[in-house]
């Protein structure tokens, strides 16, 4: 257990940061799930609209280094590709 004042303070700060970061990670996952849900429904317009809002959220969380920037870019790229591919099977 933390015995010095500075160790107690660091423990408090770590708990606070952990709580904040957990909330942001949850927001990241929720943003991705919202786009996935729209893609699964097959609504390209709605999926694109939600993707724009989610992209902003994903970028903000990556800028704060809650998730790595490459992970954020990978998710955005895969979501964009999935949205782009929604109309492709119907055209064939």
Swiss-Prot record:
Is Ribonucleoprotein tagged as a keyword? yes
Q: Which UniProt keywords apply?
A: Ribonucleoprotein, Ribosomal protein, RNA-binding, rRNA-binding
By its UniProt entry, which Pfam families does this protein fall under? Ribosomal_S20p
Q: Which GO terms describe its cellular component?
A: cytosol; small ribosomal subunit
Give a yes or no for keyword NAD in this entry: no
User: What family is reported?
Assistant: Belongs to the bacterial ribosomal protein bS20 family.
| Record function comment | Binds directly to 16S ribosomal RNA.
Q: What is this protein's name?
A: Small ribosomal subunit protein bS20
Q: Which organism is it from?
A: Paraburkholderia xenovorans (strain LB400)
């Amino acid at each position: 257990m933390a015995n010095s004042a500075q160790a107690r303070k660091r423990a408090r700060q770590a708990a606070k940061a952990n709580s904040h970061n957990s909330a942001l990670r949850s927001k990241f996952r929720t943003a991705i799930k919202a786009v996935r849900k729209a893609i699964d429904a097959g609504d390209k317009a709605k999926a694109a609209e939600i993707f724009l809002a989610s992209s902003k959220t994903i970028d903000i969380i990556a800028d704060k280094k809650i998730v790595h920037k490459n992970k954020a870019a990978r998710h955005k790229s895969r979501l964009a590709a999935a949205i782009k591919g929604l109309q492709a099977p119907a055209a064939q």
